[in-house]
Protein backbone atom coordinates (compact mmCIF):
# COMPACT_ATOMS: atom_id res chain seq x y z
CA UNK A 1 0.00 0.00 0.00
CA UNK A 2 1.17 3.50 -0.67
CA UNK A 3 0.05 7.07 -0.14
CA UNK A 4 1.33 10.56 -0.84
CA UNK A 5 2.43 12.80 2.03
CA UNK A 6 3.48 16.11 0.57
CA UNK A 7 6.15 15.32 -1.99
CA UNK A 8 6.99 11.96 -0.41
CA UNK A 9 5.54 8.57 -1.22
CA UNK A 10 4.90 6.47 1.91
CA UNK A 11 4.83 2.71 1.39
CA UNK A 12 3.57 0.27 4.02
CA UNK A 13 3.33 -3.48 4.17
CA UNK A 14 0.11 -5.39 3.69
CA UNK A 15 -0.72 -7.04 7.04
CA UNK A 16 -2.83 -9.64 5.18
CA UNK A 17 0.21 -10.95 3.30
CA UNK A 18 1.79 -14.17 4.62
CA UNK A 19 5.17 -12.43 4.30
CA UNK A 20 4.23 -9.48 6.50
CA UNK A 21 5.10 -10.97 9.92
CA UNK A 22 8.43 -12.56 8.94
CA UNK A 23 9.57 -9.41 7.13
CA UNK A 24 8.53 -7.22 10.05
CA UNK A 25 10.60 -9.35 12.43
CA UNK A 26 13.64 -9.29 10.12
CA UNK A 27 13.48 -5.50 9.78
CA UNK A 28 13.04 -5.08 13.51
CA UNK A 29 16.16 -7.15 14.19
CA UNK A 30 18.47 -5.67 11.54
CA UNK A 31 17.42 -2.03 11.52
CA UNK A 32 15.25 -1.33 14.53
CA UNK A 33 15.74 -0.71 18.22
CA UNK A 34 16.81 -4.33 18.86
CA UNK A 35 19.90 -3.94 16.66
CA UNK A 36 20.72 -0.44 17.90
CA UNK A 37 20.29 -1.33 21.58
CA UNK A 38 22.24 -4.60 21.19
CA UNK A 39 25.22 -2.74 19.78
CA UNK A 40 25.06 0.05 22.36
CA UNK A 41 24.53 -2.18 25.41
CA UNK A 42 27.41 -4.43 24.37
CA UNK A 43 29.68 -1.56 25.43
CA UNK A 44 28.24 -1.14 28.94
CA UNK A 45 29.82 -3.15 31.76
CA UNK A 46 27.59 -4.86 34.30
CA UNK A 47 24.63 -5.68 32.03
CA UNK A 48 23.67 -9.35 32.42
CA UNK A 49 20.40 -9.19 30.53
CA UNK A 50 18.44 -6.58 28.62
CA UNK A 51 15.18 -6.89 26.73
CA UNK A 52 12.31 -4.87 25.34
CA UNK A 53 8.92 -5.64 26.90
CA UNK A 54 5.48 -4.10 26.87
CA UNK A 55 3.44 -2.95 23.89
CA UNK A 56 6.40 -2.54 21.53
CA UNK A 57 7.48 -6.16 22.07
CA UNK A 58 3.90 -7.38 21.84
CA UNK A 59 3.28 -5.64 18.49
CA UNK A 60 6.62 -6.90 17.15
CA UNK A 61 5.58 -10.45 18.08
CA UNK A 62 2.24 -10.04 16.29
CA UNK A 63 -0.09 -9.28 19.19
CA UNK A 64 -2.91 -7.00 18.03
CA UNK A 65 -3.28 -3.58 19.57
CA UNK A 66 -2.63 0.08 19.05
CA UNK A 67 0.76 1.27 17.86
CA UNK A 68 3.17 1.73 20.76
CA UNK A 69 4.19 5.25 21.72
CA UNK A 70 7.37 4.25 23.52
CA UNK A 71 9.78 1.38 24.18
CA UNK A 72 9.96 -0.26 27.61
CA UNK A 73 13.43 -1.65 28.32
CA UNK A 74 14.41 -3.97 31.17
CA UNK A 75 18.08 -3.94 32.16
CA UNK A 76 19.24 -6.57 34.65
CA UNK A 77 22.64 -6.28 36.29
CA UNK A 78 24.74 -3.65 37.97
CA UNK A 79 25.52 -1.17 35.19
CA UNK A 80 26.27 2.49 35.67
CA UNK A 81 22.78 4.00 35.48
CA UNK A 82 23.99 7.16 33.77
CA UNK A 83 25.53 5.04 30.97
CA UNK A 84 22.21 3.23 30.51
CA UNK A 85 20.28 6.51 30.28
CA UNK A 86 22.87 8.00 27.92
CA UNK A 87 22.60 5.01 25.55
CA UNK A 88 18.80 5.17 25.66
CA UNK A 89 18.78 8.88 24.80
CA UNK A 90 21.12 8.27 21.84
CA UNK A 91 19.04 5.39 20.45
CA UNK A 92 15.80 7.38 20.95
CA UNK A 93 16.98 9.80 18.28
CA UNK A 94 17.31 6.99 15.74
CA UNK A 95 14.04 5.20 16.51
CA UNK A 96 11.97 8.36 17.10
CA UNK A 97 10.40 6.95 20.26
CA UNK A 98 11.15 7.46 23.94
CA UNK A 99 12.92 4.55 25.62
CA UNK A 100 12.02 3.94 29.26
CA UNK A 101 14.66 1.82 31.00
CA UNK A 102 13.99 -0.07 34.22
CA UNK A 103 17.23 -1.14 35.90
CA UNK A 104 17.10 -4.05 38.36
CA UNK A 105 19.80 -6.03 40.12
CA UNK A 106 19.76 -9.79 39.48
CA UNK A 107 18.24 -10.34 42.94
CA UNK A 108 15.50 -7.78 42.28
CA UNK A 109 14.75 -9.41 38.92
CA UNK A 110 14.56 -12.87 40.52
CA UNK A 111 12.03 -11.66 43.10
CA UNK A 112 8.34 -12.31 42.64
CA UNK A 113 6.18 -9.27 42.08
CA UNK A 114 3.05 -8.50 40.13
CA UNK A 115 4.97 -6.25 37.77
CA UNK A 116 7.66 -8.84 37.03
CA UNK A 117 5.12 -11.64 36.64
CA UNK A 118 3.36 -9.51 34.03
CA UNK A 119 6.65 -8.82 32.24
CA UNK A 120 7.61 -12.52 32.28
CA UNK A 121 4.22 -13.69 30.99
CA UNK A 122 4.18 -11.42 27.93
CA UNK A 123 6.30 -11.21 24.77
CA UNK A 124 9.82 -9.80 24.95
CA UNK A 125 12.51 -8.89 22.44
CA UNK A 126 15.90 -10.01 23.79
CA UNK A 127 18.76 -7.51 23.53
CA UNK A 128 21.38 -9.22 25.72
CA UNK A 129 21.12 -12.58 27.47
CA UNK A 130 18.48 -14.33 25.35
CA UNK A 131 14.91 -15.28 26.25
CA UNK A 132 13.65 -15.44 29.84
Please tell me what each predicted stretch does:
Residues 1-49, 57-68, 76-132:
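Catalytic core of pol beta-like nucleotidyltransferases
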